[in-house]
Amino acid sequence: MPTDIEIARAATLQPISAIAETLGIPDEALHPYGRHIAKIDHAHIASLEAKPEGKLVLVTAISPTPAGEGKTTTTVGLGDALNRIGKRTVICLREPSLGPCFGMKGGAAGGGRSQVVPMEAINLHFTGDFHAITSAHSLAAALIDNHIYWGNALGIDPRRVAWRRVVDMNDRSLRSIVQSLGGVANGYPREDGFDITVASEVMAVFCLARDLADLEARLGRIVVAESRERKPVTLADLKATGAMTVLLKDALQPNLVQTLEGSPALIHGGPFANIAHGCNSVIATRSGLRLGEYAVTEAGFGADLGAEKFIDIKCRQTGLSPSAVVIVATVRALKMHGGVEKKALGGENVAALEKGFANLQRHVENVRRFGLPVVVAVNHFHADTEAEHAALKALCRDRLDVQAITCRHWAEGGAGAEDLARAVVSLAEGGAPATPNFVYPEEAKLTDKIRTIAQTLYGAADIQVESKAAAKLAQFEKDGYGRLPVCMAKTQYSFSTDPGLIGAPSGHVVAVRDVRLSAGAGFVVVICGEIMTMPGLPKVPASEGIYLDANGQIEGLF
């Protein structure tokens, strides 16, 4: 089997205008970026409001392992398969971040025969959306320090500036810094730090905004600091929102690309699900629902993170509700959850699979708590055995009364996921609730919301909130932010805050180290355990294998 980049490069892509035509998008509504990428202008997006919505399919997964699950690959394969069986489908994905692309995870354009293309462009600079978001965030950071430098009319307390800087790269050395050194001309020295761009509240606002007006209003609500009187200072107070919206104006138009099979895909926005809310833009999702009979989207990492935030944050704010949920699992990953080391995954081990099944079981049970119909997609790997697949399907049937379907879309494209597509259509057309069941009520205390997620979805005995975090939660409540949902930032590898505690642990304690207010996005970020909002690179980063060949073509991307 050729590599992902070789498959993508060998494909014959249609002009992006031809892809747009299948959705009824006229040429004048497109802003092309070359021959195979285009943005859809704001006016056409607004015109879609009059159209009826199709059915929304959410793709999520078990707790990820180094063995890989293939959630994006499955999302693409399912979208292709739905189109193959006659359901006009739009795929809605997040944009990849450069940090993981050059780090350990690699890109995020799918894999094998189920990819969105042009793969190199999507995984690298794409249409510059992340650069625009980084620039808007950086403008806000500059305006804060400039305001303090020129007299500080708002009375900002430099010790209580919450707005960190961002860059779209994994760089642990920037997590904690001291700024404004070198003399009085450089401002007032203070502690600061960088997050990765996908953790920026500007990214979250970008992905939750309905339109440009909503974007500007949300930017204005962002709290960046406290005054000496402990009052919130917002970007509206700093008169930053107009210029920031100008920087984001073009970026807010969703990006249209295609799959290897010519299915339309909207790729827009890209918050991580372990340190942010993990969903693509509301604008792209809503557009996909009005352009197709089905819109297939994903939420990052496992259902405990991405799917919970999709429901409790994105659906709560927008009124969206999935008609069906797909949980992606692999035999390999479940064997790892059952205690098998990665190097030993090639051998048949039904006993380990049965032990690791507890992880899948909890994710299925959690999705059912939302009141949503669910199916399991078993992403096939070449080393899997028939006995392992039969055992997994039997476990799903006997213990959970849920259908598990073997999918071969990585090797076969959409044809390998047609059984999954038919199962999804059956679930979606069988009737789903107009509104999902949220995990906690809006009026609950912030601490109670955190505890409810930990105990209900993670299997925890309780939470342990550090004193600094408890004081900030109390202040948020006092300032009127108590009705906001919470956005859990924790390791993606475990239901606990310990990445080594795999499977389905129970009785653990979720340690809450810090909290951050995202008033513009409309949630409170809860930082648990040792999770970092600025990742680091691994010992051998993926960047070491990326290069240009003698013909100027990119090699090594995956």
From Swiss-Prot:
Pfam families: FTHFS. GO terms for biological process: tetrahydrofolate interconversion. HAMAP family: FTHFS. Gene3D superfamilies: Domain 2, N(10)-formyltetrahydrofolate synthetase, Formyltetrahydrofolate synthetase, domain 3, P-loop containing nucleotide triphosphate hydrolases. Belongs to the formate--tetrahydrofolate ligase family. This is Formate--tetrahydrofolate ligase. Keywords: ATP-binding, Ligase, Nucleotide-binding, One-carbon metabolism. NCBIfam families: PRK13505.1 (NF010030). Pathway: One-carbon metabolism; tetrahydrofolate interconversion. It catalyses: (6S)-5,6,7,8-tetrahydrofolate + formate + ATP = (6R)-10-formyltetrahydrofolate + ADP + phosphate. InterPro entries: Formate_THF_ligase, Formate_THF_ligase_CS, P-loop_NTPase. GO terms for molecular function: ATP binding; formate-tetrahydrofolate ligase activity. Its EC number is 6.3.4.3.
